[in-house]
Amino acid sequence: MVRTEGDSWDIVTSVGYTALAVAAGRALDAKLDPPLAHDDHAAAFVAAAGAPQLAAAVATADMTSSAAFNAQWVGVRTRFFDNFFADAAGAGVRQHVILAAGLDSRAYRLPWPAITTVFELDQPKVLQFKDEVLKRSGAQPSARRVTVAVDLRDDWPAALREAGFDATQPTGWILEGLLPYLPGAAQDALFERLNDMSAPGSRVAAELGPEPGELERLAASIKTVVGETSDGETQPNLRDLWFDDPRLDTKTWLGERGWTVTEANLVDAAVAYGRPLRDLPPAFENFLSTKFFTAVQDHPRG
């Protein structure tokens, strides 16, 4: 399904399906040595969604499946963003925002300090599905969890403020698996809004999208998000989902506005976590090596 302006999705179509594929990766990560994601809710999401190929891979712990290929890098990416939140909490940040939260369960599975609020923003149908699965399982969040049903191409800052977000307090922001799905102009606008809403001491961790022309190399290496199609299960192609149109140099842009930016290489991080990535297509290895960063707002906004 080719992306269109203002398009929407549920958990088994278009961009929503990729959140489900990531959940499958987190579920299978538990079978790797050592596991890095530690997500006890991921398998329940996959089982409830009605996506037979992913459900079968998770249920049988099929480590030869294409979903298992996802597991090795999804686990590393998950640990990277988990560590970011732990560092932010250790620095005293008590307000956190997960943009395009998908099936992220960090509000439940991370050991948050007392009086912590986690805001989750995503499409209404995605959040509804997640809430239903978590409710059936009896899961209880370890922080105050606030869901905000909004399209990030719309006025999400207004929706976030209405939900109780306090722009005078430091915030921990994560943009995990989001920016490749935004057109360049939408990404640039998102960071402008994020900067405007970030008090000194705020932090951000992000995964950037591909450069112009890079998408073709990635798509050639990884034909679909999770492998071949099967009956009744349509799996989207990266070319149909990601954007690689021109956009600002985000890291430089943030640096010019008082943020201290630190680049992150997830290939090196995997080694540090004790589980090196193996057999990655070169284009994908380059993506994991160059597209991640963290930043701290050290100075007043401007």
Curated annotation (Swiss-Prot):
Query: What protein does this entry describe?
Result: Putative S-adenosyl-L-methionine-dependent methyltransferase MAB_4586c
Role noted for this protein:
Exhibits S-adenosyl-L-methionine-dependent methyltransferase activity.
User: Where are the annotated coiled coils located?
Assistant: none
Q: Which SUPFAM superfamilies match?
A: S-adenosyl-L-methionine-dependent methyltransferases
Residues that, per the record, bind S-adenosyl-L-methionine: 122, 151-152
Record has Transferase as a keyword = yes
What PANTHER family does the record tag this protein with?
A: S-ADENOSYL-L-METHIONINE-DEPENDENT METHYLTRANSFERASE YKTD-RELATED, S-ADENOSYL-L-METHIONINE-DEPENDENT METHYLTRANSFERASES SUPERFAMILY PROTEIN
Q: Which organism is it from?
A: Mycobacteroides abscessus (strain ATCC 19977 / DSM 44196 / CCUG 20993 / CIP 104536 / JCM 13569 / NCTC 13031 / TMC 1543 / L948)
Q: Name one Pfam family in it.
A: LCM
Keywords carried by this UniProt record: Methyltransferase, S-adenosyl-L-methionine, Transferase
A GO molecular function assigned to this protein is: methyltransferase activity
Q: What class of enzyme is it?
A: transferase
Q: Supply the EC number(s).
A: 2.1.1.-
